[in-house]
A protein has these predicted regions:
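Face-selective signature of the C-terminal outer-membrane beta-barrel domain
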Residues: 1-104, 124-128, 189
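Outer-membrane beta-barrel domain signature
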Residues: 2, 55-59, 110-112, 164-168
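Residues that define the transmembrane beta-barrel architecture of outer-membrane proteins
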Residues: 5-9, 62-66, 115-119, 171-175, ...
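Eukaryotic, compositionally biased intrinsically disordered regions
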Residues: 89, 180-182
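Surface-exposed extracellular loop regions of Gram-negative outer-membrane beta-barrel proteins
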Residues: 94-103, 113, 127-175, 187, ...
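Short, flexible/disordered intra-domain loops and linkers
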Residues: 106-108
Length: 195
């Protein structure tokens, strides 16, 4: 039987400054995950060697995930019937992934320590005139490989201390353009995405 013993800790902090014509927001978050993955054999018929509840594998995963960010919204035009805003969102993200122990499928060692440094920016422009709203934005998003990506692809050679099959982080470029028309009786909108 495969089992987990997980613990997750974290915290979030943010501050906001509102003024005319610029709003600012700063913040960050940090999380720490501890995961023990293990398997036991509860009973094996005709086994003279293995005790009941024999633990046949165990591996430990540690993941640190921390980020800081800054956001700004600049109201270039701020009239009752016409508004134009420019915004930017900048995020730095750090991820550390540590793993050790034994693989549950082929009983090979799983030592691994990997660090990722990500910069995730987003910028956009919105224009509103009476019932019309036009918005455009560009963003870059990054994501680290999952535990399964490492478990299923990485091979560790204990004699050389080298790895093969290390997965890479994913990067997404997101372009968006949207239009909305609002009337007291109805609203209609369309969004275009390119990633």
């Amino acid at each position: 039987r495969k089992q987990l013993d997980n613990h997750f800790f974290g915290g979030v902090l943010s501050a906001k400054y509102i003024s005319e014509p610029v709003d600012l927001q700063f913040g960050g978050a940090a999380n720490y995950y501890l995961g023990d993955h293990f398997g036991t054999l509860h009973y094996l018929e005709d086994s003279l060697v293995l005790p009941i509840n024999y633990e046949y594998y165990r591996n430990n995963v540690r993941k640190t995930d921390a980020n800081i960010y800054a956001k700004a919204n600049w109201r270039i035009i701020n009239h009752a019937q016409e508004k134009l805003s420019l915004y930017a969102d900048l995020q730095y993200r750090y991820v550390r992934y540590e793993r050790n122990g034994m693989n549950d499928e082929d009983m090979t060692d799983l030592p691994l320590e990997v660090d990722f440094h990500f910069f995730n920016p987003k910028a956009g422009l919105t224009y509103q005139n009476r019932g019309h709203l036009l918005a455009a934005s560009f963003a870059i998003a990054n994501r680290e490989p999952s535990r399964n990506n490492y478990k299923e692809n990485v091979v560790y050679d204990a004699s050389t201390g080298e790895y093969t099959g290390l997965p890479h982080a994913e990067r997404l470029y997101d372009y968006e353009l949207g239009y909305t028309y609002s009337h007291p009786r109805f609203a209609i909108g369309a969004n275009l995405y390119f990633m």
